[in-house]
Amino acid sequence: MSFKSQLLILAQKLSKGGISCELIEFDECILKLEWHTELLDKNDSLLYEQEEDDILSLMNPMITMHAWIRDSPSFEVPQFFFQPYANGSDPLTKMEQIFELLEGSSQNLAYDALAIGDCPGTVGIAWYIHPCRTRDYFEMLQIDKEDPKYLSLWLLYIHQVLSPLTQPIIKAVDDAEKS
């Protein structure tokens, strides 16, 4: 099954779960995603403050996630680019801001996997999970790129790195596969 076919199937699953999806075809196929998530702190408080030095002090903002999925031609694995926005409009551009959003176990994985750079789905930069880490994950799984569950398994890795930010896409895929 081609990567484009897998992206189209993934887009159907995500759309059913309320994730906005758009297939963009430049020189390559890129699936653009958007979703919203509200993060709770350990006390379920609803606090959001922005410090003077612009480092996010964050308990429970509404986070809007923009993401792009493409096939990395160099590493031959899917690549996940993303840009979170606090309360709909404030882009989170500092590593400290991203780490404040992640669960403890995800922070450890994210430390080695996250980078920021040019995003092929936009004219700007975005965060991304480095494809060499993704390649290591697939080598451990020993799964073929043609396997119909390839992208679903890859999303589980993305979720390990970015939990709880990616919970809505995991739920959408899980719900679609159960129905």
Swiss-Prot record:
Signal peptide: none annotated. GO terms for biological process: autophagosome assembly; macroautophagy; mitophagy; protein modification by small protein conjugation; protein transport. Transmembrane segments: none annotated. It is an enzyme of class 2 (transferase). GO terms for molecular function: Atg12 conjugating enzyme activity. Keywords: Autophagy, Cytoplasm, Membrane, Nucleus, Protein transport, Transferase, Transport, Ubl conjugation pathway. It is a peripheral membrane protein. The keyword Transport applies. Its EC number is 2.3.2.-. GO terms for cellular component: cytosol; nucleus; phagophore assembly site membrane. The active site is at 132 (glycyl thioester intermediate). It is found in: Cytoplasm; Nucleus; Preautophagosomal structure membrane. It holds the Pfam family Autophagy_act_C. The keyword Cytoplasm applies. Belongs to the ATG10 family. Forms homooligomers. Interacts with ATG7 and ATG12. E2-like enzyme required for the cytoplasm to vacuole transport (Cvt), autophagy and nucleophagy. Acts as an E2-like enzyme that catalyzes the conjugation of ATG12 to ATG5. ATG12 conjugation to ATG5 is required for proper localization of ATG8 to the preautophagosomal structure (PAS). Likely serves as an ATG5-recognition molecule. PANTHER family: UBIQUITIN-LIKE-CONJUGATING ENZYME ATG10 (PTHR14957:SF1). This is Ubiquitin-like-conjugating enzyme ATG10. It comes from Schizosaccharomyces pombe (strain 972 / ATCC 24843).
